[in-house]
Design a protein with these regions (language model features):
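Generic alpha-helical structural signal
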Residues: 65, 90, 170-174, 224, ...
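Short alpha-helical hairpin
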Residues: 44, 141-152, 248-257
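GST-like domain detector, emphasizing the conserved glutathione-binding G-site
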Residues: 1-135, 254-255
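Long, positively charged, glycine-interspersed low-complexity recognition regions
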Residues: 200-258
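Alpha-helical scaffold segments in carbohydrate-active enzymes
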Residues: 91, 95-98, 175, 201-205, ...
Length: 258
């Protein structure tokens, strides 16, 4: 049996993405939480602070989309990027990476720093601290740290910030629904691929862990039906965040939309 470890921040969408690859393939693995306060020390075996880092039998690699291809090489069952659909999947993966996943960081870039904003990032700090405890003062200042992080600023430089956050969210939601189409999975594929597994945990994360009251993406009927299908392929908590921090199940969140 292979020794598999996934290193990352508990709240990183890219870490959740690789985690869902592993869950879908039904591989036993160890999640090693990385503290943002000493990431370089934890990741000294590979250098830098970028996550996720996937280690299989001592070999370490970065880049979540590359993880899908590597996992298929090592563990061909339940493919993430089937050879017959590789070109389509990699083309759509560019949209997932450059548009969908990047948009997750919009709220940290140019949102008004009001109390609602601070509550959101205090909650994220609590989720991080549940795995890698942080001092109370650091948690209190977390909204400010995130807003000033070089990684976040770099994301902002790649976005069209003249488009309002609401318009961006609506546009990307409609694009996702179009990519699902008649389904059953993204791109019209018959089985989930790396595309579905990259997006699903991001859409359910907020409602599961207290960042939104309702599963907002599920208000679109195409996306809601797709979420229900995807949930059948993954554990009840596919996010890597501790179960003790969960406030709502995916099944309850979907039922609340009926």
């Amino acid at each position: 049996m292979s020794d598999i470890k996934l290193y990352g921040y508990a709240t990183s969408p890219y870490v959740r993405k690789t985690g869902c690859f592993l869950y879908y393939k039904q591989l036993d693995f160890e999640f090693v939480p990385v503290s943002p306060l000493n990431a370089a020390e934890t990741l000294d075996f590979i250098g830098g602070t970028q996550v996720p880092v996937l280690v299989i039998d001592g070999e370490a690699r970065r880049e979540s989309s590359e993880h899908a291809l590597w996992l298929d090489e090592r563990f061909p069952e339940r493919p993430l990027c089937p050879s017959g659909h590789r070109e389509k999947i990699l083309r759509l993966d560019k949209w997932v990476s450059d548009t969908f996943l990047m948009s997750i960081f919009r709220g940290a870039i140019d949102s008004e720093p009001n109390l609602q904003y601070r509550y959101r990032f205090w909650r994220l700090a609590a989720l991080v601290s549940a795995h890698t405890p942080m001092p109370e003062q650091i948690r209190h200042l977390w909204p400010d740290f995130v807003a000033q992080a070089p990684f976040i600023k770099a994301m902002g430089e790649k976005m069209d910030l003249t488009e309002s956050p609401a318009d961006m969210a609506m546009r990307i939601g409609m694009e996702l629904a179009a990519h699902i189409g008649e389904g059953p999975y993204i791109g019209g594929l018959e089985q989930p691929s790396m595309l579905d597994l990259a997006i699903f945990p991001q859409l359910v994360f907020g409602v599961m862990f207290g960042l939104e009251e309702r599963l907002s993406a599920g208000q679109h009927p195409v996306i809601k039906a797709w979420l229900s299908r995807m949930a059948e392929h993954l554990p009840a908590n596919p996010t890597l965040v501790a179960d003790t921090m969960q406030l709502m199940s995916i099944s309850d969140a979907l039922a609340a939309l009926d």
